[in-house]
From Swiss-Prot:
Cited function: Transfers an acetyl group from acetyl-CoA to L-serine, forming acetyl-L-serine. In vitro, also has homoserine acetyl transferase activity.
GO MF term set: homoserine O-acetyltransferase activity; homoserine O-succinyltransferase activity; serine O-acetyltransferase activity
Chief site of localization: cytoplasm
Entry protein name: Serine O-acetyltransferase
Keyword field contains Transferase: yes
Organism superkingdom: Bacteria
Organism: Lactobacillus acidophilus
Taxonomic placement: Bacteria, Bacillati, Bacillota, Bacilli, Lactobacillales
Marked site: Important for substrate specificity: A156
Residues of the active site: C107 (acyl-thioester intermediate), H200 (proton acceptor), E202
Top EC group: transferase
Residues annotated for substrate binding in this entry: K128, R214
Length: 262
């Protein structure tokens, strides 16, 4: 695997095995190492599926990787200060920054990183952004190369970062939004290795259905709206091209950066 780029992934998602499978599929030509936050399991046993497929996060290993991903997490309605492992996340963010590793942050991971690096505030939404939506490219970026206006991508979150704050920060660019102006991608002009993605473009075609079913099974007393522009009975992989193009672009960015550093 010497010729492969090495990617570390901090997997914070609810379905650890599904998430791992998704990233293995979208990054087939990379050497992937999955991690879990140590502080999350300080006072409770580590689930077997986590222990078997992931390693405890070791900040000292960050420099081994050419790229690093922090996934989403089902905690976007919780204040950052209340997250039991937030300090561990911040140590990781600082280490990634120190070593200038290519960074890709998804959903909650993007929220935590934007808050840490730029002080951007998180806002809880009146209702969940949930479904598959067309998108507008507002500022071109290499990671969006090959995507056309109207490209499709899935969203599933209860919070949004403060767009006004982002727009007022000259270090940041909003590169794409959905048709309701919800964030898809924010990039850092001051540190081009940082990229923040608010869509779950790693999802497979059944993932939105699985997420909906998981929520209603966990809380049958609550009302959950079904995903928009998405058939629960016959899901369509409308974002497959988006997924392939985006991750190919990011892998190219990681490889190019590795060549420069070497």
């Amino acid at each position: 695997m010497a010729n492969k780029v090495k990617i570390g992934i901090l997997n914070l998602m609810h379905d650890k095995l599904d998430t791992q499978s998704h990233f293995i599929k979208v990054l087939p030509n990379a050497d992937l190492t999955f991690f879990y936050p140590r502080m999350h399991y300080q006072n409770r046993p580590i689930p077997p599926e986590v222990n078997m497929t992931s390693e405890p996060l070791d900040i000292n290993r960050v420099s081994e990787f050419d790229g690093f991903i922090i996934t989403g997490a089902p905690i976007d309605q919780i204040d950052f200060s209340k997250i039991t492992y937030i300090e561990e996340i911040r140590y990781l963010l600082q280490a990634l920054d120190n070593h200038k590793i290519q960074q890709l942050y998804f959903c909650w991971g993007a929220m935590a990183a934007l808050n840490y690096f730029y002080g951007i505030k998180k806002k809880i939404l009146a209702e969940k952004i949930f479904g598959v939506f067309p998108h507008l490219i507002t500022e071109p970026h290499p990671l969006l190369s090959g995507l056309s206006q109207g490209f499709m991508a899935p969203h599933a979150r209860y919070a949004e970062m403060d767009k006004k704050q982002i727009m007022q920060d000259e270090r940041l660019a909003i590169n794409a939004v959905d048709d309701n102006s919800h964030l898809f991608m924010v990039s850092a002009k001051d540190n081009p290795e940082r990229n923040f993605i608010f869509s779950h473009i790693e999802y497979g075609k059944d993932s939105l259905r699985d997420e909906y079913n998981r929520e209603i099974n966990a809380h049958p007393e609550r009302h959950y709206k079904k995903p928009i522009n998405y058939s629960m009975s016959n899901p369509s992989f409308q974002w497959q091209d988006t997924q392939k193009i985006f991750f190919n672009n990011w892998l190219k960015k990681v490889k190019d950066n590795k060549l420069v550093l070497n």
